[in-house]
Amino acid sequence: LSLGLMPYSIVGYNYSMTETAPSSITAGSLKTDYTYTGEGGITQLYFGLGFRPFSWFSLGANLQYYFGSIEYSSSASFEEVYVPTIMQRTISVTDLSGNFGVQFTIPLKKEMSLTLGGTYQLKSSVNADAEQTIITTDTVAQNFNNSFDFPMSFGTGFVFNYLNKFTIGFDYKNEFWSDVEFFGEKEFLDRNKFILGFEYLPNPNGRAYFERVYYRFGANLSKSYYTVNGEQLRSLVLSTGWGFPLKKGLNPTIMNFTFEYGLNGKVEGD
């Protein structure tokens, strides 16, 4: 049984570009400055259940509730026009989805084990309320309800454990964003994610409380599902966390805390 809250998608960018083209007004050229910004994100609240029919095999499922809002803005400023054209869009999301997973544990020796696993995320259509405002010499505002897709995805990975104290894991995940529609349009690219993690448990049966605390470190590398100047941005996220035992026994209760710090790639253009 698990319950958690985590970010699903975080949007945060601000970039600009300049284009020069022949002017239809004068004999010279016309310079246009474009600016694009985006901020906000979608959060996932999940509730999970697991079942182990055999000592070497287990399966589970998560029910996921998504909520949040994202604000997009784009503007075009023309050299010979004093009033820029600005488009602002705010999208609010609330909906449910789910995923499934299986894992197999292979005992290597008495003190070592290898666990292999896989996950599958359902493709789901998400309800969204959107407000769009276009500002020129006049202001036009629209409110509409529509839907867009969250992609199907699959993941696979392994976990190696030694002495029930040292654990290292690696996961690979592929999200099929190129198959989804965003307000009727397909405008994204598939996204890959690589995740590496390490966990240390000083003494599973120790008397001292902090000997039974789990200490965790991790990193993941991924590409964005959108492009900037024709390039996908790389993202690196570093994390650290702790698992605090609340109850001993064959099925212990553990409260987990995780902190993450992320770095997004930069794209330079003219």
Where on the chain are the PLM-derived regions?
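Outer-membrane beta-barrel porins/channels
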Residues: S2-D270
